[in-house]
């Protein structure tokens, strides 16, 4: 206990400071609607979610529960831990820190380097480019993902290990957090709550099996949660909220038929990831008001492969688009 006491003291000071700040805020009316938040996954397109959430938090919205999958799960975890330490301001700072680190790390560089033996491959290519995805598609015709990535590297692991604050997420004052991953063998969604959140859980929720190694947790194997729910809405409904804010990071519709192998694969993923969410939306109680923040307009002019583009300029563009798209919600 002694070894950890300085850290715990600092942690308690931060929590106490947050409590004082929140006490000095105007008292919320008793009729204030109970609001929950659902964050869709979408790779780099999650920067749109970042922007939308930043606007909601800036305008004072508070969420009693957050559900996320894939990149949405990482945003949800950062928001929850940031809120515990410094309210909405802390949540905004924590999510921003995540995306700045993603941009600085060129997060898919590790995957690129595993393909540099291929003729014509340049590991400096962004995975968000058509040429890069053509190379990956060709490689996967000849080799399994484990052969392309024999050491099981996941570029997100060191980043999340550095950023994730499990103590904050598990603090009694934390908003409820739900992260979904897909059980490989059963095909069912596994929902992890605050008490179960770890780096491995976030990696599992974002595990695209054609790119990253399958994540094993307590003897079960998991892939991206988007295959089974994108994100899970049901856990947010008990106790029943007044409003559910859904931030999408994938377009529901795209004009035209994709022709390249890369675009076909990505569109298939978008359609597959959309179906579970549509089913849950259809089952929402009529008393719950759905506030849907769509990414359709923001993503319409970008190629399907752009979800792998972690260039800072692109992430900043999506961040700005997300803030703009969220404006009507904050006015309601």
Predicted regions and their residues:
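Patatin-like phospholipase
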Residues: 2-69, 77-332
